[in-house]
Swiss-Prot record:
The keyword Lyase does not apply. The lineage of its organism: Bacteria, Bacillati, Chloroflexota, Chloroflexia, Chloroflexales. GO terms for molecular function: ribosome binding; rRNA binding; translation initiation factor activity. NCBIfam families: infA. Its main location: cytoplasm. One of the essential components for the initiation of protein synthesis. Stabilizes the binding of IF-2 and IF-3 on the 30S subunit to which N-formylmethionyl-tRNA(fMet) subsequently binds. Helps modulate mRNA selection, yielding the 30S pre-initiation complex (PIC). Upon addition of the 50S ribosomal subunit IF-1, IF-2 and IF-3 are released leaving the mature 70S translation initiation complex. HAMAP family: IF_1. Residues 1-73 form the S1-like domain. SMART domains: S1. The gene is infA. It comes from Chloroflexus aurantiacus (strain ATCC 29366 / DSM 635 / J-10-fl). This is Translation initiation factor IF-1.
């Protein structure tokens, strides 16, 4: 998925869609993060709805924000 070595990848569920392609995601470990859609998902018009399972990349510097990189089928 990502070429970056210092990111943390976790799975979660979309709990709330927000404006400007932002989403509130409930991670599998119970934490909630604010995540936006990655650029490639925007370019390919991949739609994300409430309840979808997604893969989220988190930065080790700010664990409250993330980037959605994959939507599971």
């Amino acid at each position: 998925m990502s070429k970056k070595k210092d990111v943390i990848e976790m799975e979660g569920t979309i709990t709330e869609p927000l404006p400007n392609a932002m989403f509130r995601v409930q991670l599998d470990n119970g934490h909630e993060v604010l995540a936006h859609i990655s650029g490639k998902m925007r370019m390919n018009y991949i739609r994300i709805l409430k309840g979808d399972r997604v893969l989220v990349e988190l930065s080790p510097y700010d664990l409250t924000r993330g980037r959605i990189t994959y939507r599971y089928k």
